[in-house]
């Protein structure tokens, strides 16, 4: 017999006074259903407000009748008292009725001439739900004040927030009080603290990165939609470096509307949430969050209070934007430290950098990973004194702060990365061993304790600090950039980031494991490269969870081979870059462009030629020990590929083998093997190059980069 209970809209729970209200488990509602809930909540809120106004008017009328009786009794004794009491009664009636009418969002009697312009835009927002707010979801007449349910719906954010300040009801962006100017109220209340109203969130997924300059100079943004510009002007701060920038001209309104609709649709699919200072209620099944957790946090942190979800609470200080976002000098592009598909990296000071992502989903993933790593590493191993408070845990770089408004995360600053490091000497081989052991330990920790696969192990994502007195010596190394990271399959539907800034909860996407989206094409592990060449739609072969870690360590072996070539080639770094590395990256760009354009066959063809360059790297560094690698790869290509693709593979392999000769590295390899640290790195590279087929991923990861 099916249950007669039905799910109802959480925002419309006005008639119940149940303590500790918790929403029933809900299936993922559609956008139409959630919008219907919003309309029902608005109607119920309006009806409750009218009832509250009528009840208040009735009480005042009854009080007026009682006072009239008293006046009649006193009229025989003192005639002047009648006028006094009647006047006081009328004033009281006017005050209460005015307050009740004001709570019902009828504010014509307190409108000023300066408010007429905001009235037109407020009419549209009055259709949004305004409900009485108590921790127990009581009736409209209960409680000592009203909560206003504010719907923030812009091109890049859709959330609902309660504002409360005594007898204040929030409508749209400002807090209105009886007879006050809405433009004078520029602060909201959440979590018991005053918070300034923020400018609207600008999506960098569809606009170029903003240029901001210190000292209050206007920044440059693309033109947004009319509502976004209006909200920007209303919520701007009149003075200081945080002035809202004026939009650029030149973009059509139709294109802007299309972008806004697409962005809001995607955001609608992600979350729809209601929050106040007592509870954060989300559309995620059975999930409610406690905003009081933010009071004890200074960095993103995993709070394992629920066995069903991995909640990372992301706090934000009130003055974060003024201390971080507006303090970054973007006036000169020469200051920029890095740029790529993820966004841009700019220096903040000597010890910190700011990463401005192009997609908000990447920022959400970064802070969730940061909280997970920081919490799991806290009980595993004590940090070195030099890394305390820097956000580096177990060789993994984490974010120490986040701003969804500007799509910004704050990280520790390193000297350079391993790709741009140009000082390689055999005398510092011990520091190279420590660096790669740290990276291998970070990968094992990330897979075993955090159950997350990085999927982007490249020299560009390995940050290093060098000895200023000896630039060839690597002091410390850390793995960064989690834009391609995915949790293990058993973490699907469980990973959530909760933001204090917006009072919302954002779910981390489930793992997809499409091989074409995993790893840089030039550093992809050879077993996965072969699977992608045969089938561009292939996914990660999940026959066992140990395959994830083996794949990651195999990619780290490719990075090690990349660095060993720079270290051992007697021709020098310039020749290696113009010859060997140019061949390795020759078809990587074509593979990425084909993937962006949806030409998967062209992508697999480019990966086939990259496989030839990877094979040449191994054959050059290993010499006769690399013969098995070459023969196995050639047999695979001849058995799986067409004759024309085989000819193209052989032709490019011949070109690579002419440039990557073992004679160029033979003498330095002998010197490398004469040291214990060099022998360790050489054997580690040999073991990773032995992972050449899918079955090799079932090996023991402890044999790779052993401690």
From Swiss-Prot:
GO molecular function list: ATP binding; protein serine kinase activity; protein serine/threonine kinase activity
Coiled-coil region: none
Localization per Swiss-Prot or TrEMBL: Virion
Keywords per UniProt: ATP-binding, Host-virus interaction, Kinase, Modulation of host cell cycle by virus, Nucleotide-binding, Transferase, Virion
Record EC number: 2.7.11.1
Low complexity: bias regions: 1-14, 178-188
GO annotations of cellular component type: virion component
Family: Belongs to the protein kinase superfamily. Tyr protein kinase family. HCMV ganciclovir subfamily.
Name assigned to this protein: Serine/threonine protein kinase UL97
UniProt organism field: Human cytomegalovirus (strain Towne)
């Amino acid at each position: 017999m099916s249950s007669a209970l039905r799910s109802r809209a959480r925002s419309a729970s006005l008639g119940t006074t149940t303590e500790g209200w918790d929403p029933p488990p809900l299936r993922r509602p559609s956008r139409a259903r959630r919008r219907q809930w919003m309309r029902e909540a608005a109607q119920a809120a309006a009806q409750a407000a009218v009832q509250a106004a009528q009840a208040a008017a009735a009480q005042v009328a009854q009080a007026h009748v009682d006072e009239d009786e008293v006046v009649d009794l006193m009229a025989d004794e003192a005639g002047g008292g009648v006028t006094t009491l009647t006047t006081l009664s009328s004033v009281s009636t006017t005050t209460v009725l005015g307050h009740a009418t004001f709570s019902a969002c009828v504010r014509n009697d307190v409108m000023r001439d300066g408010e007429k312009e905001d009235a037109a835009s407020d009419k549209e927002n009055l259709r949004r739900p305004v409900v009485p707010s108590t921790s127990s979801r009581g009736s409209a007449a209960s409680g000592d004040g009203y909560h206003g349910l504010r719907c923030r719906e812009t091109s890049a954010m859709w959330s609902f927030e309660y504002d409360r300040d005594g007898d204040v009801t929030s409508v749209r962006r400002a807090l209105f009080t009886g007879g006050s100017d809405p433009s004078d109220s520029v602060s909201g209340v959440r979590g018991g603290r005053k918070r300034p109203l923020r400018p609207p969130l600008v999506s960098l997924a569809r606009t170029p990165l903003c240029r901001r300059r210190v000292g209050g100079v206007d920044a440059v943004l693309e033109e947004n939609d009319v509502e976004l510009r209006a909200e920007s002007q209303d919520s701007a701060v009149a003075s200081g470096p945080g002035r809202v920038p004026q939009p650029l001209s030149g973009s059509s309104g139709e294109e802007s509307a299309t972008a806004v609709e697409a962005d809001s649709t995607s955001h609608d699919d992600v979350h729809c949430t209601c929050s106040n200072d007592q509870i954060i209620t989300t559309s995620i099944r059975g999930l409610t969050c406690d905003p009081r957790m933010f009071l004890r946090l200074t960095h993103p942190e995993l709070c394992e209070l629920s066995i069903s979800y991995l909640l990372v609470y992301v706090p934000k200080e009130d003055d974060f934007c003024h201390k971080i976002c507006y303090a970054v000098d973007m006036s000169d592009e020469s200051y920029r430290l890095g740029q790529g598909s993820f966004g841009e990296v700019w220096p903040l000071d000597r010890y910190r950098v700011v990463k401005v992502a192009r997609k908000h989903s990447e920022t959400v993933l970064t802070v969730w990973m940061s909280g997970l790593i920081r919490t799991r590493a806290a009980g595993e191993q004590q940090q070195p004194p030099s890394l305390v408070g820097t956000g580096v845990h177990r060789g993994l770089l984490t974010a120490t702060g986040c701003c969804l408004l500007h799509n910004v995360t704050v990280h520790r600053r390193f000297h350079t990365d391993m790709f741009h490091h140009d000082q390689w000497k055999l005398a510092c081989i011990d520091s190279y061993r420590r660096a790669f052991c740290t990276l291998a330990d970070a990968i094992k920790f990330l897979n075993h304790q955090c159950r997350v696969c990085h999927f982007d192990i490249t020299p560009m994502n390995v940050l290093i600090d060098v000895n200023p007195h000896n630039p060839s010596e690597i002091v410390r190394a850390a793995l960064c950039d989690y834009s391609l990271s995915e949790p293990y399959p058993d973490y699907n539907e469980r990973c959530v980031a909760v933001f204090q800034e917006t009072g919302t909860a954002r779910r981390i996407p489930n793992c997809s494991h499409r091989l074409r989206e995993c790893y840089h094409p030039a550093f992809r592990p050879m077993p996965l490269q072969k699977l992608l060449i045969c089938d561009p739609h292939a996914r990660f072969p999940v026959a066992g969870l140990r395959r994830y870690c083996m794949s990651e360590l195999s990619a780290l072996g490719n990075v090690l081979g990349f660095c060993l070539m720079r270290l051992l080639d007697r021709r020098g770094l310039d020749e290696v870059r113009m010859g060997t590395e140019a061949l390795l990256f020759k078809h990587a760009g074509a593979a990425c462009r084909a993937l962006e354009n949806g030409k998967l066959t062209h992508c697999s063809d480019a990966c086939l030629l990259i496989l030839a360059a990877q094979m040449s790297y191994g054959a050059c560094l290993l010499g006769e020990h690399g013969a098995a690698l070459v023969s196995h790869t050639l047999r695979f290509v001849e058995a799986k590929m067409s004759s024309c693709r085989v000819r193209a593979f052989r032709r490019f392999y011949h070109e690579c083998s002419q440039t990557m000769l073992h004679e160029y590295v033979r003498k330095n390899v002998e010197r490398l093997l004469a040291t214990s640290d060099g022998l360790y790195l050489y054997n580690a590279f040999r073991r990773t190059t032995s992972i050449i087929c899918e079955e090799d991923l079932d090996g023991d990861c402890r044999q790779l980069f052993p401690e």
